[in-house]
Swiss-Prot record:
Gene coding for it: atpB
Organism: Borrelia turicatae (strain 91E135)
Family annotation (HAMAP family): ATP_synth_B_arch
SUPFAM superfamilies for this protein: P-loop containing nucleoside triphosphate hydrolases
Ion transport in keyword set: yes
Function: Produces ATP from ADP in the presence of a proton gradient across the membrane. The V-type beta chain is a regulatory subunit.
Alphabetized InterPro entries for the sequence: ATP-synt_VA_C, ATPase_F1/V1/A1_a/bsu_N, ATPase_F1/V1/A1_a/bsu_nucl-bd, P-loop_NTPase, V-ATPase_su_B/beta
Recorded GO MF terms: ATP binding; proton-transporting ATP synthase activity, rotational mechanism
Entry protein name: V-type ATP synthase beta chain
Family: Belongs to the ATPase alpha/beta chains family.
Stretches that traverse the bilayer: none
Amino acid sequence: MKRVYSKIESIVGNVITVMAQNVKYGELAIVRSKDSSSLAEVIKLDRDKVSLQVYNGTIGISTADEVKFLGHPMQVTFSENLLGRIFDGAGNPKDGGPRLEDDLIEIGGPSANPAKRIVPRNMIRTGIPMIDVFNTLVESQKLPIFSVSGEPYNELLIRIALQAEVDLIILGGMGLKNDDYLTFKDYLEKGGALSRTIFFVNTANDPVVESLTVPDISLAVAEKFALQGKKVLVLLTDMTNFADAMKEIAITMEQVPSNRGYPGDLYSQLASRYEKAIDFEGAGSITILAVTTMPGDDITHPVPDNTGYITEGQYYLKGGRIEPFGSLSRLKQMVNGKTRDDHRTIMDAMIKLYASSKESIEKKAMGFNMTEWDEKLIKYSGMFESKLMDLSVNIPLEEALDLGWEILFSCFEPKETGIRTELVEKYWPQKKD
């Protein structure tokens, strides 16, 4: 069977077309020119007409260059030696360390059999009150972080990477600015978390096709570690860059565009990645947190809109804080009844009072007379935002719950909170003499 072809039919953008037989979708090839060689991936099959996306671009490639098909899809090394290392979107070392070429595994495989999934039952502690108390992150959950450009979403991921109580962090960056890449690298090194982290990164200067491989490589490695009993947290940023890379390639391929120019299979492409989140019976788990930026703060944009149908809630980052009203963890009820007996009560009471405070703040801004109750709510709102909502707050769950009681004590009488008497008697702070 012929695997080497010496004629390229056409070159359009970063896509080349070759007439070849017995080639599979997703198969890798090497394009050899006079001065260099580049990896390429089969992205379209039309009988014997094969289209390949060239990773390093087509500059310097001519129609007389050689294309050699490798007979397998993208692969990545799997071993404990990955820990503490940084790689690009093709799995090549980016940290100056040695190449790892043993124990190769294929990426982009199917999600695990649903019959092997177990009901989520364990909390992942992060030290961030707006997550731990109000929208608990659950092991094997898949959650996006919706945000607009300019919000500290990467800083939030760094905090989670440093503090999350998991065995292993896999960080996947797509279309990262070089400054953001260096920030991740520096904080992970200084915080001592790099030793339990594997970092796959595609920067804005790297080939756009690598944005598509970063989630697949990250999740393939995560699945192997999970099957070995590891509790793995996969952090991805930014899934909108991933979707934009899909859009760019689809335009090059002259595919019929769907909503706002994105390809028609955007939903299934996103779902195939998010559905990798799983808790294996008798083994480990994969939990996915993925930043999704919203152009113009538009929740109806195709990427966040499709994502919302796939995931189990979302964290909504706005004004430098995790917004309680736009955020939701649909699995929190699976675990927040097992933490402390006042967890759900504090969560519900504080959010209800915070919602009421917004009405009082609006009344004050419009010049209405303030009642004593309005003044209490406004005071409470300020304390809640500064002591619990601020992303710089870093305390364990139990301390956050105690702090919640302190805030309520500072602003209200027990009967004004709507909390059950038995919990008030157990947790309400005592007045100091």
